[in-house]
Amino acid sequence: MEHVRVIFFFFACVLKIVPFICLAQKDKYEFPPGFNCVASGGNFTANSSFAGNLNGLVSSLSSLTSKPYGFYNLSSGDSSGERAYAIGLCRREVKRDDCLSCIQIAARNLIEQCPLTNQAVVWYTHCMFRYSNMIIYGRKETTPTLSFQAGKNISANRDEFDRLQIELLDRLKGIAAAGGPNRKYAQGSGSGVAGYPQFYGSAHCTPDLSEQDCNDCLVFGFEKIPGCCAGQVGLRWFFPSCSYRFETWRFYEFDADLEPDPPAIQPADSPTSAARTERTGKGKGGSKVIVAIVIPIVFVALFAICLCLLLKWKKNKSVGRVKGNKHNLLLLVIVILLQKDEFSDSLVVDFETLKAATDNFSPENELGRGGFGSVYKGVFSGGQEIAVKRLSCTSGQGDSEFKNEILLLAKLQHRNLVRLLGFCIEGQERILVYEFIKNASLDNFIFDLKKRQLLDWGVRYKMIGGVARGLLYLHEDSRYRIIHRDLKASNILLDQEMNPKIADFGLAKLYDTDQTSTHRFTSKIAGTYGYMAPEYAIYGQFSVKTDVFSFGVLVIEIITGKGNNNGRSNDDEEAENLLSWVWRCWREDIILSVIDPSLTTGSRSEILRCIHIGLLCVQESPASRPTMDSVALMLNSYSYTLPTPSRPAFALESVMPSMNVSSSTEPLLMSLNDVTVSELSPR
């Protein structure tokens, strides 16, 4: 009977973890684009034949059927002249129906953003669309351009870095150019340098180009690197006829996870085709049979291994201890699942090793204490410094955070996210091990009158851009799509070079990319009041726009040097809320007065643009807030015109007394900005 209960609990564990392993990466397209209205192409009049043809072409997109290769060549009009020509192209991993939807949206927005322009192009995250009054099919075009850089340069092995980068891109260029008339795309990896052991890249041309034109277009793009972004650990370049990308982390799907191309049509009497199909397992049908057989076998084997481990563990422990520490069963399953991705061997850390590293968790090594435990500085025997988070044994919420951080952070790799080095399970002990961040958290600098004088505008702008890239990775580019839910200054750690790293994923939530246009709800609201979006604080409704709101608050805090205390302060109960104050100054055209007086240098136009972006992020309506993809575009491209912000959501204090919010074990402080359920992040 006891074994039956163990097996039942095991299934409950598996069901709990399935969302983490089954949520495949799916890209979306509903992001504000990078427009370029080609001024050199001239203009047309609203009542011209070209205007009618262009509008007709865009309208006809809604009646098209999706194509298998993500490429659309379109034209509208008769032979009398003033025909409209257009091309649409999607990234390789975008599903067919999503691709067509992306191009439809891009086309509609492009003619709205570039009215009466003869030629224009727009790049979305996952597709591009261009139109012209001249034939563009089969003709290489390398202007205009759009580019993004990571903002971080390689600090050593520069020559080797540049050589291996170009070597990888050149190899991908050759593969893409030879791709044939349906698709000219290549993705792949290559050897890197110390600190970045693997390089990743992609190259893409519109398939209407000849092999030579595709090659020339990409070469033209590669030649841009030395003048703008040599040594950058990440970059993207977009041209009307081609694009390429280089990163030090895998940003693309594996080939096996991509939607397969349709089989090539062979003549019915082709013996070569028949023989090839037989040798490959009767084509697609054979692979489906193999998948149908292999998947159940894998799950049965996984179940058998888990069950054996569970029963062996149970045999060596008393029943009372099992009941008292039931979550260790779930954690054993987590280890097995991590082993599937070759993480567990390197992530599991022995308890005695951590005791030695922290001098038996000495109070002298304690960096901070939060609602779910303490954080200690430690040093491994090899000299590596670490931050050790020891969760409280009595905190049920700590269990939840522990599982979250292992399952998420173990598979998240980004320069602007804190890195999980390992974890430990020893009886009642639950311990997480992180990289050690020397400069502690952002709040220690930005809210300290003396320390924030060390932060010139260049450093603050780097912080804003780094946090934006980290959130964009969580929302769009990571293996999982994640809503952080507790972004705040104390959860932004700063390394030795003041690069920001997002920390504390205990409250993070996975979300299904098929449902990104809708909101999710929770009856248990957790987070920090000053950074909570109103729809989340009041109704428990959250989405990626919840993180965008928190980011906007953070941007305004970084620029003003003030905390968002929701209309209260320690010395003045009638103090004006930070967002309210900034909004009032914006409306009264005295916005320069909100800039931190210690910011004596730096581009005022750049600072004002960041305030503008911050106000867009804290708008009351979630639908009005930009996505992080859009924010990254706003920060990197001054050609993008910022929309006018609407009223921020700053009147939260009126609803706070009636809200059922999870609280930490710490007493509430005077500032509502500090009311939080999050523990102190590793430093």
Swiss-Prot record:
Residues annotated to bind ATP: L367, G368, R369, G370, G371, F372, G373, S374, V375, K389
Domain Gnk2-homologous residues, every copy: 32-136, 142-251
Residues with the Phosphoserine modification: S490
Domain of life per record: Eukaryota
Subcellular localization: Membrane
Cytoplasmic topological domain: 310-683
Residue ranges that the UniProt entry lists as topological domain Extracellular: 25-288
GO molecular function: ATP binding; protein serine kinase activity; protein serine/threonine kinase activity
Position of the signal peptide: 1-24
Sites of Phosphotyrosine modification: Y434, Y536
Keywords annotated in UniProt: ATP-binding, Glycoprotein, Kinase, Membrane, Nucleotide-binding, Phosphoprotein, Receptor, Repeat, Serine/threonine-protein kinase, Signal, Transferase, Transmembrane, Transmembrane helix
Gene Ontology CC: membrane
Region (Disordered): 263-283
Domain Protein kinase: 361-641
TM stretches of this protein: 289-309
CDD domains listed in its UniProt record: Gnk2-like, STKc_IRAK
Topology in the lipid bilayer: Single-pass membrane protein
Glycosylation sites: N43, N47, N73, N153
Active site per UniProt: D486
Family (UniProt): Belongs to the protein kinase superfamily. Ser/Thr protein kinase family. CRK subfamily.
Name of this chain's protein: Cysteine-rich receptor-like protein kinase 28
Species this chain originates from: Arabidopsis thaliana
Gene name, Swiss-Prot/TrEMBL: CRK28
